[in-house]
UniProtKB/Swiss-Prot annotation:
The keyword Transport applies. PROSITE patterns: UBC_2. It comes from the Eukaryota. It is found in: Cytoplasm; Cell membrane. The gene is aktip-b. The keyword Transcription does not apply. This is AKT-interacting protein homolog B. Residues 75-223 form the UBC core domain. Belongs to the ubiquitin-conjugating enzyme family. FTS subfamily. Residues 1-44 are annotated as: Disordered.
Amino acid sequence: MNPFWNMPSASVRKRSDNDEKIATADQKISPARSSSAKKQLPSIPKNAVPITKPISPPLSVQSTNGTHASYGPFYLEYSLLAEFTLVVKQKLPGVYVQPSYSSALMWFGVIFIRHGLYQDGVFKFTVYIPDNYPDGECPRLVFDIPVFHPLVDPISGELDVKRAFTKWRRNHNHIWQVLMYARRIFYKIDTTSPLNPEAAVLYEKDVQLFKSKVVDSVKLCNSHLFDKPKIEDPYAIIFSPWNPVLHDDARERMLAQKKSEEQSRGLHVSGLSWVKPGSVLPFSKEENSLQT
């Protein structure tokens, strides 16, 4: 049974008496009203908020990339996943990347140069993606060891990516294009507005000395190939010397898989032919069989 329903009548009587006293006091304070006037509610103060009026909800918080803050992180994660899928589909020759374990905004990578002035070069790098991607500036690409190149800062090792992407355009520019640009600079040298003026001048004035410094730079990068990563991360790219016990078997399996893929591709492409081997004439019955 509700205890409030069993309150003694005396307490109820006392409360009613108090209410009457308060009402009498209010009547004394309030101005006299004419009997002919209609009943009116007391005026509301200027700064008062009506109790019945609900407080308006706060404006929706927008994240830096224009999406709602509640699902902004999920949108960013989806965008980066889509970008990495595009990188895998492009199959950039000699370029390998791996997102960091600690942050999807940081990717580890390596470029293998197979011909040209920087032949045999193995250059490790890190891609830094802005936290408001894809609406912010273009990603940054920094080589672990500064490469002697007109477009690479000789101190920080950062590549001049903004040269190719002056304004990052959403849904038009992609991270795989940045990786392709980083690969292309080693095959097509550009000396306009360089980050390394010495490299640019040598390429224009003394190509032989430029080649000599490039060879030294390649040797320096390769000599540090087996060093520990500068950033401790489980997904960082690590190189180790060739170990026949570990690597021979893996190498054979990779080559066998590649050979089987080439054979299956060749069988699929060849198909059936109605052309006689060694000629351009279609198959036909032998003349002797026609005479008989």
